[in-house]
């Protein structure tokens, strides 16, 4: 349930908080594709080139760098941890840096290729790979247990969403909340400018 909670509606709510206003004002009022465009009703068209808007865009860039750096670190360490689990070979900092460099190079090439040729194809490949892994795990593992656990987790998540969202650990367990929920939400907030702009960019022709 907490996995769904940490990666589910709460995370996408942050992305949409930026993506929706940017998409609306960019396509309806011909505003630029910047995070500061969400401030269009407050600062107006002329204010998008002002100090406040520039400050918001600068903060968005810094947050994006932090979010991407954290994601790359997690991906690299999880990849190497999986290899260690299968082979028993341990990896150090040098291998982690090499893995991060390789992943960064791969995604940089996909970005340079553009949305239709690069990112779209990588996304389609990821969806196919995810579907394959899901089918292998579902059909090759304890199928009924996985289905029952998934349904139960959705029920727990739906029934306790408010409690989970507002839990601060005031009477105990604060360290867990900080290490998990607060950490993940901070991570998603850092990703929000990047993902929000991406959603805005691909939303042309779609209604809110």
Predicted feature residues:
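Acidic, glycine-rich loop-and-beta core segments that form the ion-binding/anion-interacting portion
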Residues: 114-168
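Hydrophobic, small-residue-rich membrane helices and short re-entrant helix-turn-helix hairpins
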Residues: 34-51, 111-130, 150, 195-208
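Membrane-interface interhelical loops and short amphipathic "cap" helices
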Residues: 1, 75-91, 145-178
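Transmembrane-helix bundle segments that line or gate the permeation/cavity pathway
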Residues: 1-85, 109, 138-149
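Hydrophobic cores of alpha-helical transmembrane segments in multi-pass integral membrane proteins
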Residues: 9-24, 66-70, 126-137, 184-199, ...
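Hydrophobic alpha-helical transmembrane segments
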Residues: 2-20, 56, 96-101, 168-192
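Transmembrane alpha-helical segments of multi-pass small-molecule transport proteins
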Residues: 89-115, 132, 185-197
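Glycine- and acidic
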Residues: 60-68, 115-117, 177-181
